[in-house]
From Swiss-Prot:
InterPro entries the record matches: TP53I11
Keyword match Repeat: no
Lineage, highest ranks first: Eukaryota, Metazoa, Chordata, Craniata, Vertebrata
Native source organism of the sequence: Rattus norvegicus (Rat)
Official protein name in the record: Tumor protein p53-inducible protein 11
GO cellular component terms given for this protein: membrane
Residues in compartment: Extracellular: 85-108, 152-155
Length: 189
C-alpha cells in the first residue's frame, strides 16, 4: 500500500500580487489617511503616532516672552501685596488710597496667575502654552479697559498712565501674536 503523495503546494507570491498586498494593507489599516491627512507607512507609526505632529514649533522669542511675562506678573504681585500705596500711586499718579484690601487682593490674584506663567515656561505642550498666552492677553486687555474707565471717571491724565496704557496694549498685541504662532499647524516635511 503505497501512500499517495499530496500534490506540491503552490506558494503564492503576495509581494508581487498587487491585489493581495492592497487587501493586506487595508486589513492592517496601513497606507490610508488619518484625520489629519497623514499617510502612515507602517502599523507601528500609526499606533505610536508621528512625533513631529506633537512637537511644538516654537516661534522665535516665545520663551523670552514667557519669562518676561512671568517676571512682570510676579513683581507687580509682590509690589501689590507688600507696597499697595506705592503701586496705586505709580498707576494713578498721586490719587489717595482709601483701602489697601482691594489692592492686596489684586496682588494675590496676580501671584496666582504668575505661578501659572512660571509653570508654562517649562512645558512643551502646545495647549498649555496657548492658554497661558490667551490668559495674559485677556488680563492685559481687561486691565487696559479698567484703567481707561477709571481715568475717564476721575479725569486724572498723566504721562505715566498713558505710558501704562500703551505698554498694556503692546502686551496684548505680542501675546496674541504668539498665541496664533503657537497654534499654527506645522508644515509637512
Amino acid at each position: 500500500m503505497a501512500a499517495k503523495q499530496p500534490p506540491p503546494l503552490m506558494k503564492k507570491h503576495s509581494q508581487t500580487d498587487l491585489v493581495s498586498r492592497l487587501k493586506t494593507r487595508k486589513i492592517l489599516g496601513v497606507g490610508g489617511e488619518d484625520d489629519d491627512g497623514e499617510v502612515h507607512r507602517s502599523k507601528i507609526s500609526q499606533v505610536l503616532g508621528n512625533e513631529i505632529k506633537f512637537a511644538v514649533r516654537e516661534p522665535l522669542g516665545l520663551r523670552v516672552w514667557q519669562f518676561l511675562s512671568a517676571m512682570l506678573f510676579s513683581s507687580v504681585a509682590i509690589m501689590a501685596l507688600a507696597l499697595p500705596d506705592q503701586l496705586y500711586d505709580a498707576v494713578f499718579d498721586g490719587a489717595e488710597v482709601t483701602s489697601k484690601t482691594p489692592i492686596r487682593l489684586y496682588g494675590g490674584a496676580l501671584l496666582s496667575i504668575s505661578l501659572i506663567m512660571w509653570n508654562a515656561l517649562y512645558t512643551a505642550e502646545k495647549v498649555i502654552i496657548r492658554w497661558t498666552l490667551l490668559t495674559e492677553a485677556c488680563y492685559f486687555g481687561v486691565q487696559s479697559l479698567v484703567v481707561t474707565a477709571t481715568l475717564a471717571e476721575t479725569g486724572l491724565m498723566s504721562l505715566g498712565t498713558l505710558l501704562l496704557l500703551a505698554s498694556r496694549l503692546l502686551f496684548v498685541i505680542v501675546s496674541i501674536y504668539y498665541y496664533y504662532q503657537v497654534g499654527r499647524k506645522p508644515k509637512k516635511v
